[in-house]
C-alpha cells in the first residue's frame, strides 16, 4: 500500500509587504509539518509583482516543494505573467492549465493545477448562448475544464493524484456564501473531469465565507481559503 503524503494547503493568503513577517512564520511552520505545500490562488493582494516578490522571498529557502495556481486577485492589475515569474523565481511551481509530478519520499504525487472560472451550477448556469461577451465567459470555463481533463489523464499513473484550483468546482463548499453570487465563485462544469478520473483530493479557495469540505462523488473537495479554515494552513494526509 502506498504511503500517505502530508500536505499543507492554503488559499487567499493575499501577500503584501505588511504581511511579510506573518507569512514567513506561517510558511516556515507549514514546511516543518508537511511534505508538500499547495497554494490555491489569490497569492497576492492586488496582483502586483512586488507583492509576489514578498511571497517568493518568504518561500525561497523552504525545504519542501510548493505548488500554486493563480487567483482572480493575481490577475487584477494585468500583471499575471510578471506575478508568475516572480513567484517562480522563489521556487514556487505555478500551474496554469498544466500539471506537475512531485516525488515525496518515493511517492509520486501528480498535481493538476488551473485557476478555474465562473459560470454557476446546475439549475443556474451561464449558457453558451447569446452575446459574444457571455459566450466568451463560457468558453473560458471550457478551456479550464479541458485542462483538467488533460492533466488528470497525464497524472493517472501517479501514486497520488490531486487537483488544485482557485474557483470552486462544487456548490457544497460554497454554503455560507450568498446564493446569488455562487455563479461568480465557481462552476459545476469543473466537476465533470474530477468525477470521471476520481483524484485523491481537490483543493480550492476563493469562497471566503464558504464551507471547508464537500465532495464530488467519492472525491473529497477542500475549501482551504484561510478565512474558512481559520488557520494559516490546513493539514491533510492524502
Give the residues covered by each predicted segment.
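Binuclear metal-dependent phosphoesterase catalytic core
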Residues: 1-4, 81, 102-105, 175, ...
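Short, structured coil segments at secondary-structure junctions
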Residues: 62, 90, 216-219
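N-terminal active-site segment of His-dependent metallophosphoesterases
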Residues: 1-65, 75-78, 134, 138, ...
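Active-site environment of divalent metal-dependent phosphoester hydrolases
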Residues: 14-19, 44-49, 73-83, 101-104, ...
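Charged helix-capping and loop-helix junction motifs
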Residues: 24-25, 50-56, 82-86, 180-189
